[in-house]
Regions:
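Catalytic domains of carbohydrate-active enzymes, especially glycoside hydrolases
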Residues: 19-35, 227
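Phosphate/pyrophosphate-binding loops at sites that engage ATP/ADP/AMP, CoA/4′-phosphopantetheine
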Residues: 25-26, 30, 146-160
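Hydrophobic "anchor" residues on beta-strands that sit immediately upstream
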Residues: 29, 70, 90-91, 159-161
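Short, basic/glycine-rich phosphate-binding loops at helix/coil junctions
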Residues: 35-39, 161
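Conserved strand-turn element in the central/C-terminal portion of the radical SAM core barrel
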Residues: 159-169
Length: 260
């Protein structure tokens, strides 16, 4: 996307995309996650046609030069997800809305037989920060996932990954409440994905900007790993891979990294 909150993740030319992919793979990234619609707070609306155009441009490059790379697409639109899987071989659907913004998403994922990353968010990227009033944030998100996991399983979808949605319809304090209770999400018996890379929960608390937030990101990634996180969604692959390796070495278990 041209308007991602982190400038270094905005890759729009063929050369820039190829250079970024080469860097990700050389640093140990395992999955490439592509988005054509910025999900930052107050992001501009993007039409389905424009979103698909942006994704297709990058996917064609990946299919041509990196045919063996595992691809994920970040979209809340069922038809965009379908086209990415059927036309470009995308392996994973990453939906920030958990099916809330497109009623056809769950059935589409069921037909496509691909893993589904389900995130918690209220509202839309444009309105989500107006919806941070929770009586009990952990209870609400646990109930949200319980309801949606049940719906997906009734449709035959069992390959589900949970993402609590750091920074999406949550205040800074609420984000840290989630971080402190991450292990509770393991009660579902499903993989847990965490994406905190350079987000405002870091630089609004510590001061600075997204560009200043790598150290904070690494600390939170480490806390997440120690509390049951299976997949990290990151910008800075090398730092994340090193965190994974050190935690894995210390506690002798296997973890994954997930790049954006």
């Amino acid at each position: 996307t041209p308007d991602s909150f982190y400038a270094d993740s905005r890759k729009q030319t063929e050369v820039a995309i190829e250079e970024r992919i080469q860097a990700i793979l050389s640093e140990g990234g395992q999955i490439i996650d592509l988005g054509g619609y910025s999900s930052r707070p107050d992001a501009a609306e993007v039409s389905p046609e424009e979103e698909m155009k942006r994704l297709a441009f990058a996917l064609k490059i990946l299919n041509t030069h990196y045919p063996d790379v595992t691809l994920s697409v970040d979209t809340f639109r069922a038809d965009v997800a379908r086209r990415c899987v059927e036309e470009y071989g995308v392996a994973i659907i990453n939906d920030i809305s958990g099916g809330e913004l497109d009623a056809g998403m769950f059935e589409t994922v069921a037909r496509l037989h691909v893993p589904y990353i389900m995130m918690h968010m209220r509202g839309t990227p444009q309105t989500m920060q107006q919806h941070t009033d929770y009586a009990d944030i952990m209870e609400e998100i646990m109930l949200y996932f319980a309801r949606k996991v049940r719906q997906l399983r009734l449709l035959g979808v069992n390959d589900i990954i949970l993402d609590p949605g750091f920074g999406f319809s949550k205040t800074v304090d609420q984000n840290y409440t989630l971080m402190g209770h991450l292990r509770e999400f393991k009660d579902f018996g499903l993989p847990l994905l965490v994406g905190v890379s350079r987000k405002s929960m870091i630089y609004k608390y510590l001061g600075g900007t997204p560009a200043d937030s790598l150290n904070g990101t690494t600390v939170l990634n480490t806390i997440a790993l120690l509390n049951g996180t299976d997949i990290l969604r990151v910008h800075d692959v090398k730092a994340a891979v090193e965190a994974v390796k050190l935690v894995s070495k210390t506690f002798n278990f296997q973890l994954s990294t997930f790049n954006c």
